[in-house]
Amino acid sequence: MKKLSAFILAISICGYSTQAVAEIFNTSFTSIYGGKIETQQWAGKPYLIVNTASMCAFTRQYATLQKLYDEYREAGFGMVAVPSDDFNQELSSNAEIKDFCELNYDIDMPMSETLSVKGLSAHPFFKA
């Protein structure tokens, strides 16, 4: 898994500036559960930042993401689900998103508050 993670990371950062790479490794998100999610906690380990939406055709993938997180979290794998309404497919509040995910998918993986993932107002991670 380490070789695969390193390969994916190497491919994903090819052509990016040093500053952009620093943004990827040193970013934080406000948790939908309260507090902060710091990506530095997974330094040297694989992690996934994934844009999500509660009302899109792929919402059922929450269950798959949770299963992936459950399977590898003890090995140090990190994940942040990032809800965004940039595509008009998200519930109207963080509380609704949290409740929806907990009730329908029994989610306990790290999840940020609703963020912008595109354009000038995008979270720095998504601009990197």
Predicted regions and their residues:
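Positively charged n-region of N-terminal signal peptides that target proteins for export
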Residues: M1-L4
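Cleavable N-terminal signal peptides
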Residues: I8-A10, A20
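N-terminal signal peptide c-region/cleavage motif recognized by signal peptidases
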Residues: C14-S17
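A short beta-strand-turn-helix
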Residues: N26-P46, K67-Y72
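Structural microenvironment flanking redox-active thiols in thiol-disulfide oxidoreductases
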Residues: F58-H123
